[in-house]
Amino acid sequence: MAAAAAAAAAAGAAGGRGSGPGRRRHLVPGAGGEAGEGAPGGAGDYGNGLESEELEPEELLLEPEPEPEPEEEPPRPRAPPGAPGPGPGSGAPGNQEEEEESGLVEGDPGDGAIEDPELEAIKARVREMEEEAEKLKELQNEVEKQMNMSPPPGNAGPVIMSIEEKMEADARSIYVGNVDYGATAEELEAHFHGCGSVNRVTILCDKFSGHPKGFAYIEFSDKESVRTSLALDESLFRGRQIKVIPKRTNRPGISTTDRGFPRARYRARTTNYNSSRSRFYSGFNSRPRGRVYRGRARATSWYSPY
């Protein structure tokens, strides 16, 4: 009887259990077939069933069924930054969120990609500026070379003359002594203008102080003018009696003294008067030491004409 009651209780517990697992179901007297044979017998069977339930609880408790664990999805490969992503609605919402998060994480390299063209543009601009600076330096060097090679317009550069040319020019020149210190080349040219065409007037100056030395040289267009100008020897010029004699040529390597004045190095102020018949000589020596006058125009240059 006890075994039958325990089996009936187990079957009733399995069939009549509610929503909660392991819920006990008490036997009602007379409900079962075997227990309904009699009231006394049924009550006794019920009591024996309770005792069996209390003595053997392990048989009445049902073990809860284990819930199935969700299967983990394999990791999906990430698409490269430039590859087109899946369209809207093609994937699950979870996948879309993951893609959005990955896009946010991978957005930082995109900013660097945007900065790269700007950096390249800055580098290109710096290279252009360096090239322009190099071109400017080259132009400046070319201008300096041209200025050193050719004299500026308006100034007479030194012309190297041969000994024959110097002697020929000296044969058409005269020496004028006792010249007033305030005299100008234009005044001397006007004083000797009647003797012939004057190519150049040179007033010698001291190379340290720059003051006139008191004598000058006048170059004519031809030798005939030299002979005519000798007639003005001991004539008055600015209230002083001047001395007029033919000019002598300095020969290289020979130290000469002309009328008590050393003729080695000195500064000069020169005025050149060009005519259709005359030939212009910028100087007798190559070293510039003086102020040169071309015609009536006045320019500055340094050279030693005699």
UniProtKB/Swiss-Prot annotation:
Record-listed Asymmetric dimethylarginine modification sites: R238, R259, R263, R265, R267, R269, R277, R279, R287, R289, R291, R294, R296, R298
Positions of the UniProt region annotated as Necessary for homooligomerization: 155-306
Pfam families hit by this protein: RRM_1
Keyword Heme: no
SMART domains (alphabetical): RRM
Consequence when changing V143A: Slight defects in the stimulation of PAPOLA
Residues bearing PTM N-acetylalanine: A2
Record region (Disordered): 1-115
Sequence ranges of Low complexity compositional bias: 1-12
Molecular function per GO: identical protein binding; poly(A) binding; RNA polymerase binding
Biased composition (Gly residues): 30-47
Effect of Y175A: At least 20% decrease in poly(A) binding; no change in nuclear targeting; distributed uniformly in the nucleoplasm; not detected in speckles. Same phenotypic effect
Stimulates PAPOLA as annotated region, ranges: 119-147
Assembly: Monomer and homooligomer. Binds RNA as a monomer and oligomerizes when bound to poly(A). Associates in a ternary complex with CPSF4 and NS/NS1 and interaction with NS/NS1, blocks nuclear export of host cell mRNAs. Associates in a single complex with SKIP and MYOD1 and interacts with SKIP in differentiated myocytes. Interacts with NUDT21/CPSF5. Identified in a IGF2BP1-dependent mRNP granule complex containing untranslated mRNAs. Interacts with PAPOLA, but only in presence of oligo(A) RNA. Interacts with transportin. May interact with SETX.
Entry function: Involved in the 3'-end formation of mRNA precursors (pre-mRNA) by the addition of a poly(A) tail of 200-250 nt to the upstream cleavage product. Stimulates poly(A) polymerase (PAPOLA) conferring processivity on the poly(A) tail elongation reaction and also controls the poly(A) tail length. Increases the affinity of poly(A) polymerase for RNA. Is also present at various stages of mRNA metabolism including nucleocytoplasmic trafficking and nonsense-mediated decay (NMD) of mRNA.
PANTHER family: EUKARYOTIC TRANSLATION INITIATION FACTOR 4B/4H (PTHR23236), POLYADENYLATE-BINDING PROTEIN 2 (PTHR23236:SF16)
Protein name: Polyadenylate-binding protein 2
The encoding gene: PABPN1
